[in-house]
Amino acid sequence: MATKAIPKEQWEKYFDNLSKNLPAVEVQLEVVDKEIGDQVEVEYSPLLGLSYDPKDDVFEIQFRETHDHLIYHPKEIYVEEEDGKITTIEVVDKEGTRYILRIKPAIPLPE
């Protein structure tokens, strides 16, 4: 497995491209916070898309069966890859809270 940081200037295009070709996948959203600890916020729900809005500095996770999740002022995004597919996406906000998306099945890397 390889983990790589996605540069902030590439977030909008990277996640737009990823969402355009998104196969049917489910994701689990885990939130890791220093004060409240680890909590599963969404337990394997179909994913509609991922996007980053640079104007409002917000990363959006769009679910089919539950509310969308907004992460304001993200400072880092990491993608974990295995065999050329994305298995995990981790977003870290300005407070240091980590949002971990576990994807099943893994999705192909965007072109």
UniProtKB/Swiss-Prot annotation:
Q: Name one Pfam family in it.
A: DUF5335
Q: Which InterPro entries match?
A: DUF5335
Name of the featured protein: Uncharacterized protein aq_1176
Species this protein is from: Aquifex aeolicus (strain VF5)
Native organism taxonomy = Bacteria, Pseudomonadati, Aquificota, Aquificia, Aquificales
